[in-house]
């Protein structure tokens, strides 16, 4: 059934896959909260990033099931041009990651801040990298691959697949309207769309999902590095802080 839907109605399949993926994240978060309430857990000791890890593991499971049910599980192990050669293809975003890390470590860390406990820092890194795994499996492995097969591998077909998969990736961030300021979420959606187009192009060129997983996870780590190390802000607060000036960063990726 999923194979037929993917072949005959690829856009409906992609939108449906995204809806199921996002729905699974919401449902899993509520189930975790309900379970903690049943066990009378003290939420003062809860860690958002640990809960986020559980969510993303569910999302990874959904993406893997979709790939397996449509006969595309081999994408998870396809080497393409190889991981390190793939990073050379993605050299531009990789170089930006290195520069942003340098800037964060040199200028972005609070002088009088206190590091969070090690287990919470590890949860932060794990959560951010798992976001990269889950979203790349879904938006590049499921969505972008489906659109590429539909539009074809001509120059125009690749552009259409990159642009449409990028838009779907950007729209997925509208779910943050539940927790963050509307303007910040809108800016995040625009930025995520541009990144989605870029990651799609890198994925098509390299044929290796793990290249974009690494770049995506690294970007998420750097975007929340100070908050993850020192607990100075949450993801929702960070997104709420995005403003119109963020549009200038979109030009860098285009």
Show the residue positions of the predicted features.
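Aromatic-anchored segments of alpha-helical transmembrane domains
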Residues: 22-30, 94-102, 166-175, 217-229
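Alpha-helical transmembrane segments in multi-pass membrane proteins
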Residues: 15-69, 83-91, 120-123, 127, ...
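C-terminal membrane module of polytopic membrane proteins
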Residues: 217-254
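Short, Lys/Arg-rich, polar N-terminal cytosolic tail immediately upstream
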Residues: 1-8
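Hydrophobic alpha-helical segments embedded in the membrane of multi-pass proteins
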Residues: 186-201
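Hydrophobic residues within alpha-helical transmembrane segments
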Residues: 50, 54, 164-171, 186, ...
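Transmembrane alpha-helix boundary signature
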Residues: 68-73, 97-110
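Membrane-interface helix/loop boundary segments of multi-pass membrane proteins
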Residues: 134-164, 201-208
């Amino acid at each position: 059934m999923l194979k037929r839907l993917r072949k005959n109605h690829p856009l409906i399949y992609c939108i449906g896959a995204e809806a199921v993926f996002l729905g699974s994240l919401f449902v899993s978060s509520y189930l975790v909260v309900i379970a903690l309430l049943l066990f009378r857990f003290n939420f003062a000791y809860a860690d958002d990033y640990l809960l986020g890890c559980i969510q993303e593991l569910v999302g990874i499971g959904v993406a893997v099931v979709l790939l397996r049910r449509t006969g595309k599980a081999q994408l998870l192990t396809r080497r393409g041009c190889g991981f390190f050669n793939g990073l050379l293809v993605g050299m531009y975003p990789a170089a930006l990651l290195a520069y942003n890390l340098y800037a964060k470590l040199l200028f972005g860390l609070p002088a009088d801040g206190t590091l969070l406990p090690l287990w919470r820092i590890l949860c932060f890194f794990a959560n951010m990298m798992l976001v990269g795994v889950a979203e790349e499996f879904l938006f590049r492995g499921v969505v972008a691959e489906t659109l590429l097969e539909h539009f074809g591998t001509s120059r125009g077909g690749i552009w259409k697949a990159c642009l449409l998969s990028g838009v779907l990736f950007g729209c997925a961030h509208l779910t943050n309207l539940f927790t963050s300021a509307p303007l910040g979420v809108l800016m995040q959606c625009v930025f995520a769309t541009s990144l989605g187009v870029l990651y799609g192009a890198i994925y098509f060129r390299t044929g290796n999902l793990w290249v974009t997983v690494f770049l995506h996870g690294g970007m998420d780590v750097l975007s929340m590095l100070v908050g993850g190390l020192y607990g100075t802000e949450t993801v929702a607060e960070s997104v709420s802080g995005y403003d119109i000036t963020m549009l200038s960063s979109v030009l860098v990726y285009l």
